[in-house]
């Protein structure tokens, strides 16, 4: 099922509310390009999350019959990724019969200048050589890393969506989706969204689809939930109970634990949640694919991390075929800690004793080098050195046991 903020996104500039100044600036800029005398090669659209930066760029392309060549700059981390956009724009003709192309680089403030070496420089080169107009978006345009980009672009700021336009939009969605929403609940959503239309629509959809109606109690409960990270048990429940991909993905990305530990939690509890053996197989298949993407991401191709999250959340949630039935209801199950964590907890005292021995050995070497190179041989002839190392009774007992195993 498509997310409502995408389903009800304005297609044309005339449908974009509360952004008259930005629309006028963009229209003048794109017309200067179409007339062959661009007043700026690139525009930096900036404003808070959910105000419609990407929507405005897409509406501009629609109204002027331009093919939109879109890339998320914070996901495309390599210089080559940025350069490939220029190559595609320059070499390949449009297959849609449009007048030209519009390049959109989303979330340029999400680029990590330390990890994403060359990305900013790649964008600057793209701006310098481009044959087509470029729009970039950013929540925080004053990030020091974007200083050179600011100097090379036309800055266009967007306003937060006002309460009245947001109310009209939410009421329109409720009517179209046949959702009953109390006025108090609607006011609460509008107030807490603070002009973020995407947040407001997602909250409306999350409650409306789950309960069939939107009340103040439900909205307040969901708002409190969004203000904090989910503990592992809540994360599992939201993933396993999700009927839509975006619900499972939101749960995974809001978890208190990192992706490595989340995979362990999900793996441990798949057989608990799913009764059908085929559902279990499909869930583990998705999780194994997530592990593959995660390993490749750690190898430096961090673009693949998003696929890992999709598979470990949406892929696992979609494993239960019964969810497709209209009368499906989630089953409450008692989840458990990963056995891996339990084993680590039980062995902590043993590992602490071992580490104390290694610290005594590692006088002229690092801990890890001593652990890997010296410690295995030390177990063979440790009795000759126990007095010199001042080993206590507990450490001697550990060595006696370890040397026999």
Curated annotation (Swiss-Prot):
Family annotation (SUPFAM superfamilies): P-loop containing nucleoside triphosphate hydrolases
CDD domains linked to this entry: AAA (cd00009), HLD_clamp_RFC (cd18140)
Coiled-coil region(s): none
Gene Ontology molecular function, alphabetical: ATP binding; ATP hydrolysis activity; DNA clamp loader activity
Similarity remark: Belongs to the activator 1 small subunits family. RfcL subfamily.
Assembly and oligomerization: Heteromultimer composed of small subunits (RfcS) and large subunits (RfcL).
Protein name, per record: Replication factor C large subunit
Organism the protein comes from: Saccharolobus islandicus (strain M.16.4 / Kamchatka #3) (Sulfolobus islandicus)
């Amino acid at each position: 099922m498509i997310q409502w903020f995408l389903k009800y996104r304005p297609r044309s500039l005339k449908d974009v509310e509360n952004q008259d100044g930005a629309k006028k600036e963009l229209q003048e800029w794109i017309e200067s390009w179409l007339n062959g005398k661009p007043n700026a090669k690139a525009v930096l659209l900036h404003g808070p999350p959910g105000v419609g930066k990407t929507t405005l760029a897409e509406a501009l392309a629609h109204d002027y019959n331009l093919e939109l060549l879109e890339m998320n700059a914070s996901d495309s981390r390599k210089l080559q990724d940025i350069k490939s956009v220029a190559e595609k724009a320059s070499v390949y003709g449009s297959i849609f019969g449009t007048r030209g192309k519009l390049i959109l680089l989303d979330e340029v403030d999400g680029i990590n200048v330390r990890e994403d070496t060359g990305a900013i420089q790649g964008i600057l080169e793209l701006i310098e050589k481009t044959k087509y107009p470029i729009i970039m978006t950013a929540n925080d345009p004053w990030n020091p890393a974007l200083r050179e980009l600011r100097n090379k672009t036309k800055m266009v700021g967007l306003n937060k969506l006002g309460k009245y336009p947001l109310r009209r939009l939410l009421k329109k969605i409720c009517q179209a989706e046949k959702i009953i929403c109390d006025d108090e609940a609607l006011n609460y959503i509008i107030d807490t969204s603070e002009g973020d239309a995407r947040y407001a629509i997602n909250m409306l959809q999350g409650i409306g689809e789950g309960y069939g109606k939107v009340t103040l109690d439900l909205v307040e409960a969901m708002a409190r939930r969004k203000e904090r990270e989910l503990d592992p048990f809540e994360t599992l429940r939201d993933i396993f109970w999700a009927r839509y991909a975006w619900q499972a993905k939101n749960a995974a990305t809001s978890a208190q634990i990192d992706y490595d530990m989340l995979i362990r939690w999900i793996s441990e509890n798949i057989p608990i949640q799913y009764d059908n053996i085929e559902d279990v197989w499909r869930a583990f298949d998705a999780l194994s694919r997530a592990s593959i993407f995660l390993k490749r991401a750690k190898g430096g191709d961090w673009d693949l991390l998003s696929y890992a999250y999709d598979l470990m959340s949406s892929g696992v949630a979609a494993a239960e075929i019964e969810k497709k039935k209209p009368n499906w209801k989630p089953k409450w199950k008692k989840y458990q800690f990963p056995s891996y964590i339990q084993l680590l907890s039980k062995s902590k005292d043993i590992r602490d004793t071992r580490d104390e021995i290694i610290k005594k050995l590692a006088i002229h070497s690092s801990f890890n080098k001593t652990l890997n190179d010296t410690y295995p041989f030390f177990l063979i002839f440790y009795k000759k050195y126990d007095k010199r190392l001042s080993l206590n009774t507990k450490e001697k007992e550990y060595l006696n046991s370890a040397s026999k195993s």
